[in-house]
């Protein structure tokens, strides 16, 4: 398959902390989660994220008709986005960029705007984009004593919750997000 071998070769050859150009997986069938690898050895595919997305949406009682872009990025890239988008000039583990603004969790401010996010071909709505810093994920997994896969899953679900309007600025918001 064109592009598939080069994707794995680019990711396998990458150093964990060395930025590499983004390479997208070829679209073979309609996916709900599109994964891009910018840096590091990448062995977690879209199926991993799709199962987590389905589970999170099920728990929240949200229909499973969303699509998300996930990019595994370098420390430099996530720091740059954090500074540009949030005004925080430091490295972080995960950033989320929702396609809609929310009044409160699961309630978009402009419900009509959602119709513009529908891909008529697939029937899926674009929920937004999640950036995960792979090297921070690896460091946190070691720090917390669990697998990189578990930490990656936690960061992804955390990002999905942000895409759906959840936040953790106040203690109550934090509790709601954790529940």
Listing of model-derived features with the role each one plays in the protein:
Residues 161:
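Periplasmic solute-binding protein
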Residues 1-153, 164-179:
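An acidic/histidine-cluster motif and surrounding catalytic segment
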């Amino acid at each position: 398959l064109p592009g598939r071998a080069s994707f794995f070769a680019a990711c396998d050859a990458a150093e964990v902390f060395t930025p590499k150009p983004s390479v997208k997986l070829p679209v073979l069938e309609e996916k709900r989660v599109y994964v891009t690898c910018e840096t590091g050895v990448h062995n977690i595919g879209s199926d991993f994220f799709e199962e987590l997305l389905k589970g999170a949406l099920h728990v929240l009682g949200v229909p499973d008709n969303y699509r998300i872009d996930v990019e595994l990025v370098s420390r430099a890239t996530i720091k740059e986005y954090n500074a540009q988008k949030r005004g925080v000039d430091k490295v972080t583990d995960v950033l989320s960029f929702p396609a809609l603004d929310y009044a409160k969790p699961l309630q978009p401010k402009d419900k009509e705007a959602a119709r513009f996010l529908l891909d008529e071909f697939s029937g899926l709505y674009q929920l937004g984009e999640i950036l995960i810093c792979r090297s921070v994920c690896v460091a946190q997994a070691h720090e917390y004593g669990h697998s990189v896969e578990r930490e990656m899953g936690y960061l992804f679900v955390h990002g999905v919750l942000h895409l759906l309007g959840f936040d953790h600025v106040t203690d109550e918001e934090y509790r709601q997000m954790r529940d």
